[in-house]
């Protein structure tokens, strides 16, 4: 629930549930998820990220301090991820070209060859990284990536600006009224 719903609402339910739950193992697991979700709330520092790009170079999130970083956790086998690439990525990049945004694509579900083939096939421009192993990968764990596509916006200060950011097609169809628009336009 912490991954998909408003954190404030789930925090209330979590507090009430803790009062009545008698299964300590379940409570420990829930506490772990709560702690991870809590760390990802807007204003908190984004977890350190160190991944390899398609050329084998190590890339860190901290390399982009002073810029917005729109992170797209995606998968080669993810239909909705591919749909976004095909239908929105170019319009999205064009619309926001004046906002100093780095587009970071982190592939979580495949090996290196399939990932590189997908980068070429979908002409992914931006920072392309791989976090093989998905739920087992430390970056995916730190960012609480439970499903894909999963989007986040990191602020210019390196802190989380939006923990559950909308996908590009939703932002484009909002006509400038999305949370994404409010955050980036508020920085100019």
Language-model features, listed with the residues they occupy:
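Active-site acidic short loop of glycosyltransferases
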Residues: 65-67, 98, 124, 145
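Thiol-/selenol-based redox modules, centered on thioredoxin-like
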Residues: 153-188
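Generic structural signal for well-ordered beta-strand positions
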Residues: 59-60, 161
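Conserved redox-active cysteine motifs that mediate thiol-disulfide chemistry
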Residues: 65-66, 73-90
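Oxidative protein folding and maturation machinery
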Residues: 1-59
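Short, internal strand/loop/helix patches
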Residues: 50, 116-157
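Alpha/beta-hydrolase fold active-site loops
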Residues: 68-69, 149
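Structural microenvironment flanking redox-active thiols in thiol-disulfide oxidoreductases
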Residues: 82-122, 134-141
